[in-house]
Amino acid sequence: MPELPEVETTLRGLLPYLTNQLIYSLTLRRRTLRWDIPSHIESRLPGHRITTVCRRAKYLLIDTNAGGSLIIHLGMSGTLRLLAPETPLRPHDHVDIMLNNRRVLRFNDPRRFGCLLWQEDGQIHPLLQRLGCEPLSDSFNGDYLYQCSRARNVSVKTFLMDQRIVVGVGNIYAAESLFRAGISPLCEADKISLQRYRRLAEVVKDILLYAINRGGTTLRDFLSPDGRPGYFKQELFVYGRQQQPCKQCGSLLRQTTIRQRTTVWCGHCQG
């Protein structure tokens, strides 16, 4: 599933080409993804402009002057690409937004776990109402994590992936952050010191920013809007490397399951 760096990479690729563009048409080839796509957007959006594009957690918000914003989530396998209008359709090309710069924004989602929803101006969609802190913001720091973790009797990996605490950190970046901070993913969240949480917050920010600069992590489905893969996969220390030698100490990496998620860590470096 695309995590924050992949969504941020998509945002940065789209923003220069979508801002202030007039929407000529919107074509829905499928009416339902994870949830029903609001049918009114087909008639509501043409003739209006995209004012900006932003990100909240793993959601992309395409703001318009039509009185609201499109909310897009890429789900497990979704991609957004900017294409020439004559580009042949591929299987699972569900949505086209035709723009006045002779480009079409095409949403492809083979597994259909993504979504395309609508948020009226002045309202906050229910999906966005309980989201936690943005990890690249100034408010995300070790003190914040420490305070949120008190009386939280869950593993630190589960805690770090809780979107009500911090958004956009999924299995890949939680595993990598905990490794580089030297914290076992099995450690209980409320047993970790303030000093170690401060280190963890720094590492999370550093890894996310580095992954964004590397175009995200392409494991199977993710491509940036220009069709290029992300290259952070080459930098992974633990994720997906179970039973391989630790790049740092040479010990065999361990594997377990935490909340139905495969978790890989180094028993020596994260002891």
Curated annotation (Swiss-Prot):
InterPro entries on file: DNA_glyclase/AP_lyase_DNA-bd, DNA_glyclase_Znf_dom_DNA_BS, Formamido-pyr_DNA_Glyclase, FPG_cat, MutM-like_N-ter, Ribosomal_uS13-like_H2TH, Znf_DNA_glyclase/AP_lyase
E.C. code: 3.2.2.23, 4.2.99.18
Catalytic residues identified in the record: 2 (schiff-base intermediate with dna), 3 (proton donor), 58 (proton donor), 261 (proton donor)
The record's free-text note on cofactor binding: Binds 1 zinc ion per subunit.
Cofactor(s) for this UniProt protein: Zn(2+)
Keyword line: DNA damage, DNA repair, DNA-binding, Glycosidase, Hydrolase, Lyase, Metal-binding, Multifunctional enzyme, Zinc, Zinc-finger
Flavoprotein keyword on record: no
ZnF (FPG-type) ranges: 237-271
Entry superkingdom: Bacteria
One of the GO biological process terms: base-excision repair
The keyword Zinc-finger is annotated on this UniProt entry: yes
Binding-site residues, DNA: 92, 111, 152
Catalyzed chemical reaction(s): Hydrolysis of DNA containing ring-opened 7-methylguanine residues, releasing 2,6-diamino-4-hydroxy-5-(N-methyl)formamidopyrimidine; 2'-deoxyribonucleotide-(2'-deoxyribose 5'-phosphate)-2'-deoxyribonucleotide-DNA = a 3'-end 2'-deoxyribonucleotide-(2,3-dehydro-2,3-deoxyribose 5'-phosphate)-DNA + a 5'-end 5'-phospho-2'-deoxyribonucleoside-DNA + H(+)
GO MF annotations in UniProt: 8-oxo-7,8-dihydroguanine DNA N-glycosylase activity; class I DNA-(apurinic or apyrimidinic site) endonuclease activity; damaged DNA binding; zinc ion binding
Family the UniProt entry places it in: Belongs to the FPG family.
NCBIfam families for the chain: fpg, PRK01103.1
Subunit description: Monomer.
HAMAP family attached to this UniProt entry: Fapy_DNA_glycosyl
Function: Involved in base excision repair of DNA damaged by oxidation or by mutagenic agents. Acts as a DNA glycosylase that recognizes and removes damaged bases. Has a preference for oxidized purines, such as 7,8-dihydro-8-oxoguanine (8-oxoG). Has AP (apurinic/apyrimidinic) lyase activity and introduces nicks in the DNA strand. Cleaves the DNA backbone by beta-delta elimination to generate a single-strand break at the site of the removed base with both 3'- and 5'-phosphates.
Name this polypeptide is given: Formamidopyrimidine-DNA glycosylase
